[in-house]
Amino acid sequence: MVSLNYSSSPESRVLARLTGGGFDRAKTAKSIEKFIAGYVKAARAEGGVVVGLSGGLDSAVVAALCARALGGSGRVLGLILPGASTPNEDVEDAAAHARELGIEHQTINIEPIVERCMQVLPDIDNKVARGNLTARVRMSVLYYHAYVGRRLVAGTSDKSEISIGYFTKFGDGGADMIPIAGLYKTQVRELGRYLKVPGAILQKKSSPRLWADHTAEDEIGMSYETIDPILYMLVDRKKTAKEAAAALGVPIDTVKRVQAMVVKSAHKRAMPAAPPRL
């Protein structure tokens, strides 16, 4: 895993720009809440929204924003969807935060659904394939409840995950709106502090929990404190890999790794390919 000294390095200044005094947390929250309320109204989603609650940072922030935008009682449904690799503490953290927000919430164990699917699928020992199946089962359960309750599905991916493709296509990437799509992971954490998300969730390592001991940063191979300044330079500032590396004082190979993730995952951010109009 890449480990960099942020105490005096150039990228620390970029990170500070993203999450420090230049990041107006109150204004950002108000803007996103206005977006949520307006989108739900325009869609005539009488039931409000349904959010998948993982017990992690992103879903906690999205749930809090939705509760503030729509009012907690009845218009926000939080679904906690544990699988075989979901720690009990995640379920408990998600439920406790939902109660704190005053939103309706339910816990549905999706493992029987995943297991039934595996019984009729080829017996292949591939944890990523099974993990992606798990994510897509969660999406299906969210949309089931959305349809029944006349709700929209509020996605919980952030700009870091979307940019590098760290989500399952038609799984956790499937949503009607993604309130924090414009915020990098480090910014979401700062917004979480403003929204008074519990400390246990704020400090928890990001993980989709698709298999045992699964954490995002271990799978990616670097921290979001490293990824976000690089993405800012590549995506927002439109710098080349060489320019970004020079500006941040990081190895060019590290920048190119992030750049490669962005390029390789472009299909995840696009509509399905179709032939030219005949």
Task: Identify the residue ranges that each predicted region occupies.
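Helix N-cap / loop-to-helix initiation motif
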Residues: D58, Y184, P198, S223, ...
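Catalytic subdomain that performs nucleotidyl-dependent activation
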Residues: R99, A129-R138, L152-P229
